[in-house]
């Protein structure tokens, strides 16, 4: 009887020893652990590759300020916006290349390469006009076409975003503004003052003035016309002298 019990106990212990061990209890460095580590590393590597490819296909969104100040060439503008004459200004130009230095008295314009070239030729003829009567300006001014204007003050006194360029009929047009300002502005009256002013009785100085023109601006995600303020003239300001001067 005792021999039978011993035999059963030994058989039971041998069966327990021969049973497969659980993966949770496998010691480090065992083949099962190595397989799991290799599998985990492979999955992690594949996950990194997938994430990198996903980032390349779907780049991170830009900041709102970058989108607001960026180029508007991707914004398609309806040509009907330019059909109404009340939206046109002689100091606003839409062109595919930089316009000439001088300006023709025209309304909102669109210049292709050939038109701009012809106007450049006309501009060279008009750059140095001949004054036969000794005509002089009271204040020296300079006029230039301004590009890349991104912000301006509208007629309500608010800062608005100006469209630098627009996509019209699958062509990108830059928006230019013809601005005039004093060559050497001086906000304080000086003895010399403006040209041709009697300095014995008047103090004078030159200053840049502004006017409103209609420009294409951004309102949310769409283009709209607004009155914005730009430099348009250089004028002379005179102040009568008193006995205290």
Curated annotation (Swiss-Prot):
Domain of life where this protein originates: Eukaryota
Major localization class: secreted
Biased composition (Basic and acidic residues): 47-66
Family statement: Belongs to the NGF-beta family.
Organ and tissue specificity: Expressed by the venom gland.
Matches recorded under SMART domains: NGF (SM00140)
UniProt name for this protein: Venom nerve growth factor 1
GO CC terms: axon; dendrite; extracellular space; synaptic vesicle
Signal peptide residue numbers: 1-18
UniProt region (Disordered), positions on chain: 47-69
PANTHER family per UniProt: BETA-NERVE GROWTH FACTOR (PTHR11589:SF10), NERVE GROWTH FACTOR NGF -RELATED (PTHR11589)
Prosegment location in residue numbers: 19-125
Molecular function via GO: growth factor activity; lipid binding; metalloendopeptidase inhibitor activity; nerve growth factor receptor binding; toxin activity
Glycosylation sites: 148, 151
Keywords from the named record: Cleavage on pair of basic residues, Disulfide bond, Glycoprotein, Growth factor, Lipid-binding, Metalloenzyme inhibitor, Metalloprotease inhibitor, Protease inhibitor, Secreted, Signal, Toxin
Known function: Nerve growth factor is important for the development and maintenance of the sympathetic and sensory nervous systems. It stimulates division and differentiation of sympathetic and embryonic sensory neurons as well as basal forebrain cholinergic neurons in the brain. Its relevance in the snake venom is not clear. However, it has been shown to inhibit metalloproteinase-dependent proteolysis of platelet glycoprotein Ib alpha, suggesting a metalloproteinase inhibition to prevent metalloprotease autodigestion and/or protection against prey proteases.
GO biological process: cell surface receptor protein tyrosine kinase signaling pathway; modulation of chemical synaptic transmission; negative regulation of neuron apoptotic process; nerve development; nerve growth factor signaling pathway; neuron projection morphogenesis
Disulfide links within the chain: 139-206, 182-234, 194-236
Family annotation (InterPro entries): Cystine-knot_cytokine (IPR029034), Nerve_growth_factor-like (IPR020408), Nerve_growth_factor-rel (IPR002072), Nerve_growth_factor_bsu (IPR020425), Nerve_growth_factor_CS (IPR019846), Venom_nerve_growth_factor (IPR020433)
Quaternary state and interactors: Homodimer; non-covalently linked.
Annotated compartments: Secreted
Pfam families with a match to the protein in the record: NGF (PF00243)
PROSITE patterns, alphabetized: NGF_1, NGF_2
């Amino acid at each position: 009887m005792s021999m039978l019990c011993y035999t059963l106990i030994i058989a039971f212990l041998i069966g327990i020893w021969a049973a497969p061990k659980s993966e949770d209890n496998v010691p480090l460095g065992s083949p099962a652990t190595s397989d799991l580590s290799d599998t985990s590393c492979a999955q992690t590597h594949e996950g990194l590759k997938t994430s990198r490819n996903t980032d390349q296909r779907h780049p991170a969104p830009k900041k709102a300020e970058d989108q607001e100040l960026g180029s508007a060439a991707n914004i398609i503008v309806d040509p009907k916006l330019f059909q109404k004459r009340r939206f046109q200004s002689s100091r606003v130009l839409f062109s595919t290349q930089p316009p000439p230095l001088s300006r023709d008295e025209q309304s909102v314009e669109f210049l292709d390469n050939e038109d701009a070239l012809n106007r450049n030729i006309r501009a060279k003829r008009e750059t140095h006009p001949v004054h036969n009567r000794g005509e002089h300006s009271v204040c020296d001014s300079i006029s230039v076409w301004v590009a890349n204007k991104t912000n301006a003050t509208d007629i309500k006194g608010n800062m608005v975003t100006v469209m630098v360029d627009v996509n019209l009929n699958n062509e990108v047009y830059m928006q230019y503004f013809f601005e005039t300002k004093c060559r050497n502005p001086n906000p304080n009256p000086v003895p010399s003052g403006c040209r041709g002013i009697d300095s014995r009785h008047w103090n004078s100085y030159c200053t840049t003035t502004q006017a409103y023109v209609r420009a294409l601006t951004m309102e949310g995600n769409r283009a709209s016309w607004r009155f914005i303020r730009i430099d348009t003239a250089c004028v002379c300001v005179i102040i009568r002298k008193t006995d205290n001067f």
